[in-house]
Each structure stands twice: as C-alpha cells, then as structure tokens.
C-alpha cells in the first residue's frame, strides 16, 4: 500500500503508514481556510494517493474536507488509512476565523459525529478517531466519552482510539492507557512536547505529528508568530540548514528525525509539493 515512500509502524495499531501523511484541513475551504474548487480538491486528493502517501487526517469541523474525501477518493478506500476526529458539536454553525468550534464530549455527540463522518466519507469504518481539542481525563470521564468511542470500536466502525493532545493534558492522556494514537504538535520551532513524544512511543502509542513544518515555510501566512523569519533566524535554525535546503525542507527533516514519530501530516493544495 505504501509504495516506495519511507514507512513506519504506527505503534501498537500495527498499521504501516507512510512517514509523510496528508493533512486534509487544507481542503476545508472558506470561511476558515482558503477557497477551493471541487476540481482542486479532486486533483490534490488523487495526487496524494498517486504519490504513495497512505495516511489522511481530517476532522468533522474541517469544512468541506470530509465531503471531498468521500466524493473523490472513497472508491480508492483500500489505498489509505483514514483518521478523523470527534467532539466537535455536530450541527453547530461554522466558527468564524480566529475562533474555535464548540466541543461537546457527551456520548450522544461522539456517536453522532462519527456516524456523520462515515456518511460524508462514504466508508464503513475509520482507522483512527481522535478526540479533538485535547480534553482532560476528567472531562472525558464525566461524559463517558471514551466508552462511547469504544462501543463504536466494538461495532467495527472505529479501528483505533486516538487523541489530538497537547499540554497540559497530554501526560495524563498517555497514562490513561486507552489511546492507540496521539496527534501532537511538534517542529523545530515548537518543541514543548518533544520528550512526551518519546514517552508515548515507549508505551506503544503511535505518534502522528502535526505542524511539522510550522504551518508553512517561515514568512508565509499561517505561522502563529508575529515574525516567523525572525523566530527562525534568532533560534539559529538557518545555520543548521544544508546547502540548497529551504526552511520548509529543514523543518520537515527535523520533524522526521525524531525517533518517536511515525508519520507527520502536511497540507497543501499544490500537487507538485
């Protein structure tokens, strides 16, 4: 399935994933993302699979992303592992740019969200479903959220439970012992979770890295820093680049070098990338 691209086993899931995955947030469209046509979405999704990439990550609150996946590559479902998220309030209006979507971790909302994702993406199962927005252990237990996802797993609709985790809740999420996959932000410009990635890998958790190229080459829009170039240079990262290497290439190389990572998801609308 993985073609000639480098692969890794995603922890105890035993899924052999390409070390480069596709972050389908890039095809969400407006108002929270760049406008996109159906033709663009079809082109990039098929280019991703044609290149050999076999891990696609999306979410129920990524605009048109799930619908595009169902419309354009559901017929190629045996070529990729599909990960989505749960916890976003089903039926809530799209949150304006710069704000977060509401999250509800009740059993009813978890089930409704997964069922919606299955319909949208025209598939009978999801390889990974991750809790969105890094909820605390207390919040998950209060609403029976993990049990809801485990029930869906027993029904064959979800293969592996995951968490899109960040500090301060990431350590307890690792210790809970129920998550097969963690999605964690990490790059040369964002390293607070570095040791936790190693800790998760040691206990058999599969690590999916997001933000591995810091949401784009420094200097491009979307990097959450006032002056990304200044941040990149002040950290001395430009001095570590190989001859002819772009900042994006360096950031990706750095992320891929972490021994505890298994795949890093990167988004683009340009098939040449």
Positions of the model-derived regions?
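N-terminal binding-site loop/beta-alpha segment at the start of enzyme catalytic domains
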Residues: 1-84
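Short, acidic/polar
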Residues: 34-48, 103-122, 165-173, 247-252
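Active-site groove signature of glycoside hydrolases
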Residues: 116-137
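Beta/alpha (TIM)-barrel catalytic core signal, keyed to glycine-rich beta->alpha loops juxtaposed to Asp/Glu
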Residues: 4-7, 133-273
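Active-site mouth loops of central-metabolism enzymes
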Residues: 26-39, 96-111, 138, 237-242
């Amino acid at each position: 399935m993985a073609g000639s691209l480098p692969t890794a086993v995603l922890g105890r899931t035993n899924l052999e994933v390409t070390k480069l995955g596709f972050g389908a947030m890039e095809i969400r469209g407006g108002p929270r993302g760049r406008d996109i046509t159906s033709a663009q979405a079809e082109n990039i999704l098929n280019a991703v699979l044609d290149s050999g990439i076999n891990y696609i990550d999306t979410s129920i609150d990524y605009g048109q992303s799930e619908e595009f996946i169902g419309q354009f590559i559901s017929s190629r479902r045996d070529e990729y592992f599909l990960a989505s998220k749960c916890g976003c309030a089903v039926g809530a209006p799209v949150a304006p740019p710069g704000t977060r979507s509401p999250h509800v971790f009740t059993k009813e909302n978890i089930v409704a969200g997964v069922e919606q994702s299955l319909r949208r993406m025209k598939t009978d199962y999801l390889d990974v479903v991750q809790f969105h927005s890094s909820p605390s252990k207390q919040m998950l237990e209060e609403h029976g959220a993990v049990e809801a996802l485990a029930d869906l797993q027993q029904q064959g609709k979800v293969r592996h439970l995951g968490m899109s985790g960040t500090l301060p809740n990431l350590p307890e999420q690792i210790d809970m012992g129920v998550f097969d996959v963690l999605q964690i932000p990490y790059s040369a410009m964002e390293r607070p979770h570095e040791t936790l990635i190693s800790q998760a890998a040691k206990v058999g958790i599969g690590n999916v890295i997001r933000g591995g190229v810091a949401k784009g080459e420094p200097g491009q829009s979307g990097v959450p820093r006032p002056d990304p170039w200044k941040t990149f240079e002040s950290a001395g990262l430009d001095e570590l680049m190989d001859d002819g290497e772009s900042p994006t290439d360096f950031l990706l190389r750095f992320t891929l070098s972490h021994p505890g990572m298994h795949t890093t998801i990167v988004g683009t609308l340009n098939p040449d990338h």
